[in-house]
Amino acid sequence: MNLENSSIQALVKLIDDPDDSVFEHVRGKLIQFGPDAIPYLEQSWENDYYGLIFQTRIENIIQDIQFEVIKNQLLEWTASSEKDLLEGAIIIAKFQYPDLDDSQIYNSIQAIRKDIWLELNDNQTAYEQVKIFNRIFFGMHHFQGDTKNYYSPVNSCINVVMESKKGNPLVISLIYSIIAQKLDLPIYGVNLPNHFILAYMDD
């Protein structure tokens, strides 16, 4: 066992310290270790029962670590020149689903892209291409708004929306534009007051 691992284990054992100043110091150190501390925290949560306060503190520390990871990834994403929409959507979804498999989302996006690509050709007008896109995206793959649980947080998580085919208008539009741009169709989001719409931006 290396020094870092032993330090994490020692800190985890101090989580139930009744002195708030000690706990805050321990919490800060564990957050600094980042995701490397999570397996030790989860193991202690499962195997060591020192009461409800102990377990609640562990849960909160894990959430704090995950939040810091997501925050840093989003800061890097906003600072990047590319600002890949799919990557950004996955980062946001990982706040709710930290263990989600990126490859499943990429593969699902690629499969839909292929279905549409097979029916497109250069002789079609923009209107015809969008009509084909809509038929496959909404008709074949059944993407639609979630009218029953419109305000559910999971409707903003791209992994859930890709699986259920239901989500809020923003994420449905996001997925639509991601696939369109992968097909070299110039469809981009336009942020209007209280609305987010898509537009075909043909120069």
How would you label these PLM feature ranges?
Residues M1-D203:
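A structural boundary/capping signal
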